[in-house]
């Protein structure tokens, strides 16, 4: 007889074990403690729980893993076509499970109102055309009635509403959808936050809102920066553009992530990604956004089974049966970032520095209880699969330390920094032979880093 077929519970996470077996040549003193979302008062971190409206994943499979991740927000898609299969009759049971299932874990849902509905001759796919919705009075009226029903149902739990997803340069039709939808939401829920997806149509939509005197309808402008190097597309130009129309506008990195395998379609396709580079990519995206004060949503919590493929962006690996296989290294990395960088950690911004490394290095500065915290990483190239660190002499300006420790943020390993290898002079600190690589490492005061001795499984 042959060997029994493995079940999802018997698979080993090979890449996670290799991450744990690697590390800088420093003395490990523990592992950074993780936090459940219930134990974090507030933060700007979000994770994607998208595509449940099209059954590309099952919420019940990963529900508990969202709270364990430590994020305080999660993005859902409302699924007009799934909620209204018969004209005028709404079934929100499936969405109730998601909204209230997140809320009970102290994770605040934010909802993207989308897509079209075949019973009103509009489509429900990614990139769905808006023309059938806005150029038919019956369909637009039905859409607004659906929005009203959705907002009224969840307004005690949800106050952040994104209008459509990735309208793909349909600026005239998107503006025609945005204005009545946003006006309705603001009427139904005066404290609501309206988010607009940017996808090649920002300026024309802004111009139309300005012409109509409706700039106040929008609070956040969302962008989806899928770039091979996560340190590109940092949002500064986008922020400058939208704030030139209204200083109240804020930007939101509402969807970005990295595949864990070479994909042949969707964002980031045709590049040989792995679970090693995925983990580095996600953490660099998070660190770069957070340094700039940009709220961030990581795409996505679990692999998505599209009709023609199994997409590998998930922090959790799943199979074609929607079964959970294992948490990828990226899951642990996001967990460590979300657990430490809550709203008690204040943003300082990018810090000036000097190093003897030929590679471009980013140093992000923060403060926790008035004490310095920094994230440091190579930011010049696409994340590699290498599990090796370079010894670098680094002087950080504007960061003083008294008893620093070194944290590798993917594995969460905490290391001693020998006293002979660092010194603080005034507000600057110099480290000798500090191990750096193309993923964020954190330096923080020992007293600020809650540790555990347990090895992470």
For each feature predicted by the language model, list its residue ranges.
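Alpha-helical scaffolding within the catalytic cores
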Residues: 26-33, 56-64, 93-98, 143-150, ...
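Substrate-binding cleft and catalytic face of glycoside hydrolase catalytic domains
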Residues: 66-217
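Solvent-exposed beta-hairpin/edge-strand motifs
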Residues: 395-415
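Carbohydrate-binding surface patches
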Residues: 353-401, 440
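Noncatalytic carbohydrate-binding groove/subsite architecture in carbohydrate-active enzymes
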Residues: 171-288, 292-296
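C-terminal beta-strand-rich structural cap/linker in extracellular carbohydrate-active enzymes
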Residues: 416-457
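Mature N-terminal, pre-catalytic/accessory segment of carbohydrate-active enzymes
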Residues: 1-69, 79, 447-457
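Aromatic/acidic polysaccharide-binding cleft in carbohydrate-active enzymes
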Residues: 258, 264-342, 348-360, 369
């Amino acid at each position: 007889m042959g060997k029994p077929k493995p079940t999802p519970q018997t698979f080993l996470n090979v890449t996670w074990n290799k991450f744990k077996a690697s590390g800088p040549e420093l003395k490990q003193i523990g592992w950074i403690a993780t936090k459940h979302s219930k134990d974090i008062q507030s933060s700007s971190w979000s994770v994607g729980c998208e595509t449940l409206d099209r059954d590309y994943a099952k919420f019940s499979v990963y529900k508990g893993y969202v709270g364990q991740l430590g994020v305080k927000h999660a993005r859902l898609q409302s699924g007009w076509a799934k909620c209204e299969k018969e004209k005028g009759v709404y079934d929100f049971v499936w969405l109730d499970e998601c909204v209230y299932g997140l809320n009970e874990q102290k994770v605040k849902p934010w909802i993207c109102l989308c897509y079209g509905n075949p019973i009103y001759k509009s489509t429900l796919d990614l990139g769905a055309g808006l023309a059938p919705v806005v150029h038919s009075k019956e369909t637009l009226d039905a859409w607004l009635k659906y929005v009203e029903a959705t907002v009224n149902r969840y307004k005690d739990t949800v106050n952040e509403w994104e209008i459509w997803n990735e309208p793909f340069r349909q600026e005239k039709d998107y503006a025609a959808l945005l204005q009545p939808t946003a006006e309705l939401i603001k009427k139904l829920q005066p404290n609501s936050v309206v988010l607009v997806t940017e996808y090649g149509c920002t300026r024309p939509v802004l111009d139309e809102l300005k012409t109509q005197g409706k700039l106040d309808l929008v609070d956040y402008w969302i962008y989806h920066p899928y770039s091979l190097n996560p340190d590109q597309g940092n949002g500064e130009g986008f922020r400058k553009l939208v704030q030139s129309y209204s200083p109240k506008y804020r930007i939101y990195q509402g969807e970005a992530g990295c595949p864990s395998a070479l994909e042949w379609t969707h964002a980031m396709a045709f590049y040989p990604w792995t679970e090693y580079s995925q983990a580095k990519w996600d953490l660099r995206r998070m660190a770069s956004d957070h340094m700039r004060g940009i709220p961030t949503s990581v795409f996505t919590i679990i692999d998505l089974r599209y009709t023609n493929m199994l997409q590998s962006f998930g922090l959790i690996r799943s199979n074609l049966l929607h079964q959970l296989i294992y948490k990828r290294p990226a899951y642990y990395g996001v967990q460590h970032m979300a657990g430490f960088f809550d709203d008690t950690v204040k943003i300082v911004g990018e810090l000036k520095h000097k190093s003897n490394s030929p590679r471009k290095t980013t140093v992000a500065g923060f403060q926790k209880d008035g004490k310095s915290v920094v994230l440091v990483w190579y930011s010049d190239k696409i994340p590699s699969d290498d599990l090796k660190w370079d010894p670098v002499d680094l002087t950080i300006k504007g960061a003083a330390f008294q008893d620093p420790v070194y944290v590798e943020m993917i594995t969460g390993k905490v290391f001693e920094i020998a006293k002979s290898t660092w010194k603080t002079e005034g507000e600057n600190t110099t480290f000798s032979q500090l191990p750096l690589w193309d993923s964020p490492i954190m330096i923080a005061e020992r007293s600020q880093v809650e540790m555990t001795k347990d090895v992470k499984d």
